[in-house]
């Protein structure tokens, strides 16, 4: 049997067994090496499958004259002995996800890059520059401090330095420890885009000479130019430069990911961790750059770092889109930072709500970032942040355990028992949003309506005032949906959906029009909001979809046509948010229930005619597994520490009931006629 680690369609597998991956980050480089064994033991006992950890270039590499010395075994400093750290993980039967950067952020000086990687004058390293020719400076420098120029990733010298760093990490740490020989199951390349700037505008980078030279080859047009600002669009052909530059953004990221990780290709799964889109028009910029279907061998993953989604609906929506863009593992969920980011995150209920929202929207695993508070690092890697780092993790800096640890153990055990079966269930796929990337390419430029009027076209929309509004309409009806890339999806992928809706534009390439027309002829329904395409990619007449689609004048009409999509699920209260995953062959369902209201009590829904209810405090969450029509497993967060409210957790499905004996957080697993119950009070 093939037991190698792999990721298929966003799901982690060992051999042919799907595994819901529960991971925890431990910044060993910020802790005393003497603490590692104890902390890893406690991480394992919390139900964690794998430890994720950055290997900071700045921490392990030191320059002596012109010579760079690397330390992976602690000969210069004990907490540089990452080889020992990896061995201790293996001893505890913890898998490992290694994150070599090169830029890692992690609140380290210069994002963990060594000083000699800065694009200083005379260094021979190009800076990353924006449309104004301004170099990007270290985005997380101390207030009023010197900002080192960030290197252009595809600059010949920096690229060679990075590949040499990756080769060193591979040779010294990864090569002999790849699963099944060792415990390394994946390697993460880069961090939240390039420099934690994944959501940046398409004119923010990269106008360096090295990038522009590659762009010219990519565009394959004579006299191609990289637009630095929006000029008046006087004729339809003026759009080509804007389309090409926007299309280049995703290809640019593919080049960075694949160049940096070339030594790893085909040897270990490679993952990335993308951060959420910005508000408003930022969604179009993000959709332009994030096209994972075009990154073969690079597996989609994501982070969070928004305001608490239980307290802020905009963050709720942005995080949902990030989780839903493509199935993948959540590689950073804030379980530890309340002082540095938002005070709400000191409370376990906030972390649980975020975690379950991501899973409900498609995450195939989650990460506790970080599992451990640390307090033993030197100023060479961070002279800015106070100790401990972070401030409210499940395991404190002295090794003591917290309420978060107890709750984490309950969630981890739920997915340890039920993870494979959950991953064999499917979310509702009745409705899909048709993502047509070229619409994002133009929408990101925010072209004025008067320019569109010159060639009698409606403004093109994709994310902002399109996908975001569609999601809000669907969630207000408790409707789930999937996102399908119309350019890359196969006919079989389209066939999974009864409805495909999108905000229309005046053009669409002929190949995609034909694909959608075939989908429509086979019984699917294509719904354009606004304009339907009548030109192809060359802006020539092409009306393949004219009689193969429906048109709506207003987005608000969409709900009346498709309802909530899933005819099995009914929820009357929009403040009770429910997601259903189903495997009819196994007679198994999972329900994620999130209470957005400020009221505690029963949250009601029905599925296939069976009434269901979960008793929750305000702003809390639960997950329930149903097997053969009965409650099989349940996790209910019955305590809201932030608002000092609590309930006696209870769940009902049809005539079947589970009720705890006291106000608590509870995990209940059915074993025959009895329940195995664990609580945190």
Label for each model-derived stretch:
Residues 29-45, 282-290, 348-357, 489:
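Short, acidic/polar
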Residues 1-50:
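N-terminal carbohydrate-binding accessory modules
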Residues 65-75, 91, 102-146, 178, ...:
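Aromatic- and acidic-residue-enriched segments that line the glycan-binding/catalytic groove
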Residues 36-120, 261, 507:
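Aromatic-lined substrate-binding rim segments of carbohydrate-active enzymes
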Residues 158, 163, 170, 177, ...:
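Carbohydrate-binding surfaces of carbohydrate-active enzymes
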Residues 27-34, 59-62, 68, 73-79, ...:
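Acidic-and-aromatic substrate-binding clefts and catalytic sites of carbohydrate-active enzymes
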Residues 20-24, 51-53, 96-100, 185-189, ...:
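Hydrophobic faces of well-ordered beta-strands that scaffold small-molecule active sites
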Residues 78-92, 96-98, 117-189, 410-421:
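An active-site-proximal structural segment forming one wall of the substrate-binding cleft
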């Amino acid at each position: 049997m093939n037991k190698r680690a792999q990721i298929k369609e966003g799901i982690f597998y060992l051999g042919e067994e799907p595994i819901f991956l529960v991971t925890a980050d431990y910044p060993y480089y910020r802790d005393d090496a003497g603490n590692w064994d104890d902390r890893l033991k406690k991480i394992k006992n919390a139900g964690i499958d794998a430890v994720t950890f950055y290997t900071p270039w700045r921490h392990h590499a030191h320059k002596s004259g012109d010579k760079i010395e690397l330390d992976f075994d602690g000969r210069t400093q004990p907490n540089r002995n990452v080889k020992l750290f990896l061995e201790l993980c293996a001893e505890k039967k913890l898998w490992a996800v290694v994150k070599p950067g090169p830029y890692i952020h992690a609140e380290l000086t210069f994002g963990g890059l060594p000083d000699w990687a800065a694009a200083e004058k005379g260094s021979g390293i190009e800076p990353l520059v924006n449309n104004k020719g301004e170099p990007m400076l270290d985005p997380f420098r101390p207030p009023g401090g010197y900002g080192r120029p960030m290197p252009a990733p595809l600059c010949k010298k920096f690229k060679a330095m990075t590949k040499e760093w990756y080769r060193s990490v591979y040779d010294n740490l990864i090569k002999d420890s790849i699963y099944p020989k060792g415990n390394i199951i994946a390697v993460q390349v880069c961090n939240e885009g390039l420099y934690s700037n994944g959501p940046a505008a398409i004119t923010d980078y990269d106008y360096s000479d090295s990038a522009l030279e590659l762009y010219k080859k990519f565009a394959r047009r004579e006299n191609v130019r990289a637009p630095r600002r929006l000029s008046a669009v006087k004729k339809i052909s003026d759009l080509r430069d804007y389309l090409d530059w926007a299309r280049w953004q995703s290809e640019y990221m593919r080049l960075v990911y694949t160049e940096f990780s070339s030594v790893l290709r085909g040897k270990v799964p490679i993952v990335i961790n993308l951060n959420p889109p910005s508000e408003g028009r930022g969604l179009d910029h993000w959709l332009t750059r994030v096209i994972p279907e075009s990154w073969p061998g690079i597996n989609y993953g994501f982070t969070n770092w928004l305001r608490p989604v239980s307290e802020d609906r905009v963050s709720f929506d942005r995080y949902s889109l990030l989780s839903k863009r493509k199935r993948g593992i959540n590689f950073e969920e804030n379980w530890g930072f309340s002082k540095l980011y938002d005070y709400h995150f000191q409370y376990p209920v906030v972390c649980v709500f975020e975690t379950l929202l991501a899973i409900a929207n498609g995450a195939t695993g989650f990460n506790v970032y970080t599992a451990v508070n640390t307090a033993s690092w030197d100023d060479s890697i961070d002279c800015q942040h106070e100790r401990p780092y972070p401030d409210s993790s499940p395991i404190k800096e002295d090794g003591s355990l917290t309420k978060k640890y107890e709750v984490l153990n309950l969630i981890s055990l739920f997915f340890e028992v039920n993870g494979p079966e959950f991953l064999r269930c499917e979310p509702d796929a009745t409705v899909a949003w048709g993502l047509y990337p070229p619409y994002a390419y133009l929408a990101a430029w925010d072209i004025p309506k008067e320019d569109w009027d010159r060639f009698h076209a409606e403004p093109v929309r994709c994310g902002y005032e399109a996908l975001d509004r569609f999601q809000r309409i669907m969630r207000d009806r408790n409707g789930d949906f999937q996102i399908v890339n119309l350019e890359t999806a196969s006919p079989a992928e389209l066939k999974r959906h009864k409805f495909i809706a999108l905000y229309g534009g005046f053009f669409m390439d002929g190949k995609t029009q034909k694909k959608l027309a075939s989908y429509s002829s086979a019984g699917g329904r294509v719904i354009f909001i606004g304009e339907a395409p009548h030109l192809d990619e060359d802006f020539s007449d092409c009306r393949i979809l004219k009689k193969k689609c429906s048109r709506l004048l207003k987005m608000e009409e969409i709900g009346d046509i498709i309802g909530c999509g899933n005819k099995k699920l009914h929820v009357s209260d929009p403040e009770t948010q429910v997601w259903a995953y189903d495997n009819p062959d196994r007679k198994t369902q999972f329900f994620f229930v999130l209470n957005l209201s400020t009221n505690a009590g029963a949250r009601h829904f029905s599925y296939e005619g069976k009434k269901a209810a979960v008793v929750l405090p305000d702003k809390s969450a639960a997950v329930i597994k149903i097997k053969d029509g009965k409650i099989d497993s349940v996790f209910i967060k019955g305590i809201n520490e932030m608002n000092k409210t609590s309930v006696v957790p209870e769940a009902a499905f049809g005539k079947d009931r589970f009720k705890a004996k006291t106000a608590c957080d509870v995990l209940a697993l059915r074993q025959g006629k009895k329940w195995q119950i664990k609580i945190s009070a």
